[in-house]
A protein has these predicted regions:
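Short pre-active-site segment immediately N-terminal to redox-active cysteine/selenocysteine motifs
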Residues: 27-30, 81
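The canonical Cys-X-X-Cys-His
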Residues: 31-34, 85
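N-terminal leader/targeting and pre-domain segments
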Residues: 1-22, 105-112
């Protein structure tokens, strides 16, 4: 079964980032670049065999229910460009970067 980007929201974000390795894409519903990155990432996950140990999720900031996430992650207030990606390793932020692109993602996974 092909993998796809998981939906991360106020009810599951703690469990998601606590995974051994997880990439969280943060966006908004009215962000064309966020939608394009989601499509590109889903295409990548559909054929990827190397990064099966990594969870990939998307959080949509304007969907509501994210007060706890926002309070626990004060750095979010400084994010100026969406989409914004965060690589978590066992609940800790290991890397973060703005924008999309599978090549950039793979580079960060390989160098984490």
């Amino acid at each position: 079964m092909a993998r796809t980007v998981e939906t991360v929201d106020g009810g599951n974000w703690r469990e998601f980032i606590a995974s051994p390795r997880a990439v969280l894409m943060i966006g908004k519903s009215d962000c064309p670049a966020c939608g394009a990155w989601t499509e590109e990432l889903n295409g990548f996950l559909g054929s990827d065999a190397k990064w099966t140990d990594v969870r990939f999720g998307k959080m949509v900031l304007d969907k509501g229910g994210l007060i706890e996430f926002k309070r626990a992650n004060a750095w979010l207030a400084d994010v100026e460009e969406l989409p914004f990606n965060v690589l978590y390793e066992r609940g800790e932020r290991a890397k973060s970067w703005p924008g999309g692109g599978v090549e950039r993602l793979v580079s960060r996974l390989e160098n984490a």
